[in-house]
Amino acid sequence: MKVLVIGNGGREHALAWKAAQSPLVETVFVAPGNAGTALEPTLQNVAIGVTDIPALLDFAQNEKVDLTIVGPEAPLVKGVVDTFRAAGMKIFGPTAGAAQLEGSKAFTKDFLARHNIPTAEYQNFTEVEPALAYLREKGAPIVIKADGLAAGKGVIVAMTLEEAEAAVHDMLAGNAFGDAGHRIVIEEFLDGEEASFIVMVDGEHVLPMATSQDHKRVGDKDTGPNTGGMGAYSPAPVVTDDVHQRTMERIIWPTVKGMASEGNTYTGFLYAGLMIDKQGNPKVIEFNCRFGDPETQPIMLRMKSDLVELCLAACEGKLDEKTSEWDERASLGVVMAAGGYPGDYRTGDVIHGLPLEEVEDGKVFHAGTKLADDEQVVTSGGRVLCVTALGHTVAEAQKRAYALMTDIHWDDCFCRKDIGWRAIEREQN
């Protein structure tokens, strides 16, 4: 069968790489893909942008694609799933209505409140003055979020009132996040440890994926501004069996049932960003309506199941007939980024030292890369590569990932040196 993966990041390289391992599959197309997918013998890039929905549908119909898997959020919010389904094409992802869970933070917070799903106390604002009054009433630390899609960067964790007020001005009066920031959510600062809890949903049944933990801040020990994610590992030891059960009972099931009851039946990957307190109680920080990036990369490295088989079962409403199998080992991915990210950065730098053949128990997934006219791999984004490895412990996986990246370099590249530090501290204790 033929599979189409929509997207051009590290997540899509990992999903397409995993899909191509399925015995059911003869061809995997990636639209538009990147240099990593271009260089994979089992994958084929297609030059169509992720939000060019008519062109994506045309291609899928002409090529008789049997299954489409959507990577990024933008086409989901624009209704790619609705369009494909209306044309009778099999596609795994949520409808535009269901994708509001990521497309609007205000929608999500109101939804969580309606269904008594644990989350931070909050209020939505469109005007500066009432927002500032609320800040002064609540005090810092406090969290300010742009309502719409901001590539994972529209969240300011303000440790002082001045910082919080500046963020409100930037978003509502300034134009820090364009349309995404015309409405903001201000919410209480939650203490605890974060985890990424990702499941597959077929509208009614849920199949949990492996747990993971992302590293949002740009600097070591979680300092500096938020990014799309600087690295991740799986599994996340903070998600104990108890926490797993609580998350399913208090968050995932009520969300799936609540969406269905409101006429937005959810199918696709559902990613709950959790904050877990000292007592092991999870609260929702955010929902994403797709797999996380960079969490996908270490999770796919651990996945033993057939991803395509699971997606097909989900499209047919038969996820309850499937289980997922995982490598017992831990896996860890480190993002190599362009200097200046998440602010302004340069593109077009030649990347040296990429491994020429497959690495045992490791993989270099490409994100912001492209093939130049002379076939050299050059940078084309802020997050450029995700260097991922397996190990019997998180510490061993970390050591292997950093070793795998030793020879890879370009002008002004950087990475965090401490990905996995929370899990490694746990292992040492």
Swiss-Prot record:
The keyword Calcium does not apply. The keyword tRNA processing does not apply. Its EC number is 6.3.4.13. Residues 213-223 have a biased composition (Basic and acidic residues). Keywords: ATP-binding, Ligase, Magnesium, Manganese, Metal-binding, Nucleotide-binding, Purine biosynthesis. One of its GO terms (biological process) is purine nucleobase biosynthetic process. One of its GO terms (molecular function) is phosphoribosylamine-glycine ligase activity. InterPro entries: ATP-grasp (IPR011761), ATP_grasp_subdomain_1 (IPR013815), PreATP-grasp_dom_sf (IPR016185), PRibGlycinamid_synth_ATP-grasp (IPR020561), PRibGlycinamide_synth (IPR000115), PRibGlycinamide_synth_C-dom (IPR020560), PRibGlycinamide_synth_C_sf (IPR037123), PRibGlycinamide_synth_CS (IPR020559). Belongs to the GARS family. Monomer. This is Phosphoribosylamine--glycine ligase. It comes from Escherichia coli O157:H7. The gene is purD.
